[in-house]
Structure formats: C-alpha cells, structure tokens
Design a protein with these regions (language model features):
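A conserved acidic beta->alpha catalytic loop
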Residues: 13, 36-45, 62
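Short beta-strand-to-loop acidic/aromatic patch adjacent to the donor-nucleotide binding site
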Residues: 81-93
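Short, flexible, basic/aromatic active-site loop/helix in glycosyltransferases
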Residues: 134-169
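Active-site-adjacent helix/loop segment of glycosyltransferases
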Residues: 204-284
Length: 286
C-alpha cells in the first residue's frame, strides 16, 4: 500500500518548509507533493531545491483556489501509482502514528472514500466532523450565534463521536484528510468552481452521491495552528467573510438546489452577518 501527502503552499513558505522537514523521514509516506499555488513571494526559488526521490514540487501556473491546487497534487500522486493521498495545510503538525491510524480505517471498511482524525487547535479545542445539512440547517450554521443556539441540531452528539475507534460521518474538517485513489478518480476530488471555503461540504456531497463513505478516526489527532496563508493573504475579516459568503451561495445553488425564495432568504441572512462582521472589525481596530 503506497501513500503520499500533498502540501499546498501559497505565500506560506515558513510553515511549508517546517511541515516538509517534519514529514520527510516518515516511512509511512512514500512521496511528498508540494504544490505551490502561484505564490507571489520567494517560495519558488526555495521550493525548487527540495526536489528529490521523495519530494516532488509542482508549480501551478495560476492560483485557481484551494480545491484546484490540492487536485493538482492528488492527480500527480495517483498518476504515479499512489493508493492513498493525504492533504495537509502547511500550518498543521503530525505524529507518524496519525497516518498509520487513518490508513487502518481504509483496510477495515468497504467503500471508504475519505478519512481524517480529530483536529485540535493550539488551545486544545477540537473540531471533528458534522452532518450534511438541509437548506434550513445550513442557513442556521452560517451565523456564529445561531450556530451556538442550534448546535444540537447541527452537529453530531459528543457521545456518537466517542463510541468507537472510528465512526461514519458526512463532513470532515478540511485542514487534513486522506482520500483513496478510487474515490478521487470517480468523483474528481474538489469542485474547482469553489475558490475558497465550503470545500469540506462539497467533497462530502460528491463522495456520498458516488456511494463512498467518510470516517472520523477518533483515536488520533493532529494540530492545526490556524496561522496559514488565508489569514496572511486576506488580512481583512470583512474580506474573508465576503469570500466565504460567495462560496456559501454557490454551495446552496449547486448542491442544495436552492430556489429563488431560498436564495433571497440566504442573501438577507448573509447581509446581517456581514454587518455584524463589519461592526466587530471596527471594534477590533479601535
């Protein structure tokens, strides 16, 4: 069984180099693919020097987004004979046992398309997995306050996520996951119409529709420092929110088949949330 990992770099050379150095001696990883997503800094000159028998560096001609960049790496890995491929944001950290635990799930279940472990932030808070939602529930999940109020309707019960070494879920956190060659070739991986945000839901939808299952491995975890390229390149909170809302609207139309009236309500909710984001941003700037 051969396994690779894709690291997507966009103006985040420091984190990318750190992660590469941590992973390069892991025997469980046959190959490391670093995709430079048309960085505008000095990444290219440094990354070119990493090319060797274990590391392949791919330079995208233009930045077409998070999904498109990772798909470049996936396609390279599977065309070169890999059976499974992880992706990892540059600002993540792993122990080698993490990869072994995740891969073990593919061997134990049938029709597994995607697996990930628990994600932890630097403060120990965990983000795990969540169900695919109807239009109404998806609307409720957009707002920070409604998400908290209706959390019992929007997320898996804690007991469910802790009952077994791995559990079937719909959506996995996107900062690191592992996809099988078969599932990628059948679904095409990420929807490249989405530049940034909503990728987790989209790939969850595509896999389920193709008959594949996603699992959360509950006995392993990785660290996500959340200091990556998105916050570096999009420093404005309002700017990030606008980009998120563009993807939310696209997801509602394309994958939830939202009608005209539903899209109207979505735009109203988004306008309120954007206003709250602007006020919060102004408060932080004082």
């Amino acid at each position: 069984m051969s396994c690779a990992i894709v690291i997507l770099n966009y103006n985040d050379l420091e984190n990318t180099l750190r992660l590469y150095k941590e992973l390069k001696d892991f025997s469980v990883l046959t190959r490391i693919y670093i995709v430079d997503n048309a960085s505008t800094d000095s990444s290219r000159q440094t990354l070119e020097k990493l090319q060797d028998h274990k590391c392949k560096v791919i330079f995208a001609k233009e930045n077409k987004g998070y999904g498109a960049g990772n798909n470049l790496g996936f396609r390279a890995a599977f065309s070169e004979g890999m059976d499974y491929c992880f992706l990892a944001n540059p600002d993540t950290r792993f122990q080698e046992a993490y990869f072994e635990n995740v891969l073990s799930v593919f061997a134990k279940e049938k029709q597994v398309g995607l697996v990930s472990g628990r994600m932890k932030d630097p403060y120990g808070k965990q983000a795990t997995a969540w169900p695919l939602q109807s239009f109404l529930k998806n609307l409720l999940s957009m707002g920070p306050f409604s998400k908290r109020i209706f959390s019992s309707l929007l997320f898996y019960p804690k007991a469910y996520l802790e009952q077994k070494p791995y559990v079937k879920v719909d959506v996995l956190h996107g900062s690191s996951l592992c996809i099988s060659k078969e599932a990628f070739l059948k679904t095409g991986g990420y929807d490249e119409e989405f530049f940034l945000y909503e990728e987790e839901k989209v790939i969850g939808q595509k896999l389920r529709r193709a008959g594949y299952k996603s699992y959360l491995c509950t006995i392993c975890s990785y660290l996500h420092e959340d200091s990556g390229s998105t916050k570096k390149s999009l420093k404005s909170l309002v700017q990030r929110q606008k980009l998120r809302q563009k993807s939310e609207a696209l997801y509602a139309r394309k994958y939830l088949r939202a009608n005209f009236l539903q899209m109207f309500f979505l735009k109203v909710v988004q306008a309120v949330i954007l206003g709250e984001t602007l006020l919060y941003s102004l408060f932080l700037s004082k």
